[in-house]
Amino acid sequence: PLGTDWLMGTYMARRAAENVGGVVAAPISYGYRSQVRTGGGAHRCGTTNLDGATIIALVKDVLKEFARHGARKLAVIDAHFENRFYLDEACHLAIRELEYAGIQDVKILKMLYAERLKPETMAKVYEGTEFPGLDLEHGGIMETSMMMYCYPDLVRMDRIVDEGTAKFPPYDLFPGNPDWV
């Protein structure tokens, strides 16, 4: 379904917050453009992209505002593979600007939630098939399984098509070639 990334990221953030007594902010529901070689692309219906600079500025400002309000332990849950380097930069810049402002005690944990799945869980999910890697898991077995567990009412099993594992050349092409997906 549309919104899988922010839905899963929010679900994981809420579960983590329950364990540590944290608070979950509203999700940023847009991200960097999905790449064709990760099973996405702007040709996919509903795909709405932000430029990398926009993501960096948005997340940096939100982190700084939370710190201004007194938060000192922050977590950024990355639920969209292509966001990873932009979120890294946002965290670095937020810390640097906070330190320049004299706020020295803020810590930011940033993680891609899918990297925290237990090996035994992955073995069950991919039983009888090969795990293609996170970069090719866009809307694949893992994401669908997680959505079925967390939001079963949003998964339309009757619309699932087995497209097989994509095979891409070892380079990117701009604009992306939708025939690769």
Regions from the PLM with identified roles:
Residues P1-L74, A79-V181:
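Extended, histidine- and acidic-residue-enriched regions that form the cofactor-binding/catalytic faces
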